[in-house]
Amino acid sequence: MKNSADITVLGAGSYGSALAISLASNGHKTLLWGHDPVHMQTLAQDKCNQAFLPGIAFPDCLQIEADLAKALAASNNVLVVVPSHVFGTVLEQAKPLLRSDARIVWATKGLEPETGRLLQDVARDVLGEQYPLAVLSGPTFAKELAMGLPTAISVAGTCPTFTNDLVELLHSPKRLRVYANDDFTGLQLGGAVKNVIAIGAGMSDGIGFGANARTALITRGLVELTRLGEALGANAATFMGMAGLGDLVLTCTDNQSRNRRFGLALGKGCDVMTAQAEIGQVVEGYRNTKEVFTLAKRLGVEMPITEQIYQVLYQGKSPVDAAKELLSREKKSETPAQ
């Protein structure tokens, strides 16, 4: 079946819109679909996403499509950019409408709610084995990507041809550098765990602990991510790249991060509900914390920072008490014997 578009993007929030803008700015005909018809009509009229990316005009190659069937019929390349807690639901909606030659990539960062499963497992459960799968991950703030500021990300998948095609589609010499990676598991995990650690970094700064504490938390957070990744068969080297260290540093240190701002509010004394309301958009790290904690417990992986953040978010522990518990842990070597 011939494509009438180069790629279809499912999810018209800030990140989905930014990726669609970047793709269309490369000269690729891009369809952008969202679940809210009123929102999609507004996007079509304004020719920009005024709600999430105000003032950034859509390129001529970007087309708004409110009909999911039409959006999925237009291209065999489907990029899913929705919150992790609705990822499976969106795939269920898409499944009967997908072309037989469809190829699915997602930029969703997170794990399955309640179970902590990787999104690749969710996708396989819903879609079966017939479609090539891939994931896009790395340090990207939507606004900067949409503005065309230099950005670098990684992509990995189940099919090398699809991965290479995505590199060609997404890469732009002027705005976006894309690295191919063969660690499908590692790229998915990095995008979830960094959200958790960013909440912790925000809490630390909100309390007023300073740059030393923030840096220590980021460094030990990277250790936790690597530990969990290795337990799942990921390559430790992945976590020194874009989807690990890169995304972790970005999300933990810049207030464009909703997860960091959420943590800041908690550190300054807000309760969880008030802090979420203050952000006004989905704070992926709130759910990710429970998901990562669940996964670590199931695998028997020690993740003390994640555990303390979980206790703050879900068990009412104060951020100060969580910090005290981390600092009072038993002394240990930074490089334990293997």
UniProtKB/Swiss-Prot annotation:
Catalytic reactions on record: sn-glycerol 3-phosphate + NAD(+) = dihydroxyacetone phosphate + NADH + H(+); sn-glycerol 3-phosphate + NADP(+) = dihydroxyacetone phosphate + NADPH + H(+)
Amino acids binding NADPH: S14, Y15, H35, K109, A142, R258, V282, E284
Catalytic EC class: oxidoreductase
Biological processes annotated in GO: carbohydrate metabolic process; glycerol-3-phosphate biosynthetic process; glycerol-3-phosphate catabolic process; glycerophospholipid biosynthetic process
Keywords of this entry: Cytoplasm, Lipid biosynthesis, Lipid metabolism, NAD, NADP, Nucleotide-binding, Oxidoreductase, Phospholipid biosynthesis, Phospholipid metabolism
Keyword set includes NADP: yes
Pathway terms, separated by semicolons: Membrane lipid metabolism; glycerophospholipid metabolism
Annotated catalytic residues: K194
Binding site for sn-glycerol 3-phosphate: K109, G138, T140, K194, D247, S257, R258, N259
Superkingdom of the source species: Bacteria
Family: Belongs to the NAD-dependent glycerol-3-phosphate dehydrogenase family.
NCBIfam families the record matches: PRK00094.1-1 (NF000939), PRK00094.1-2 (NF000940), PRK00094.1-4 (NF000942)
The name this protein goes by in its record: Glycerol-3-phosphate dehydrogenase [NAD(P)+]
Source organism: Shewanella baltica (strain OS195)
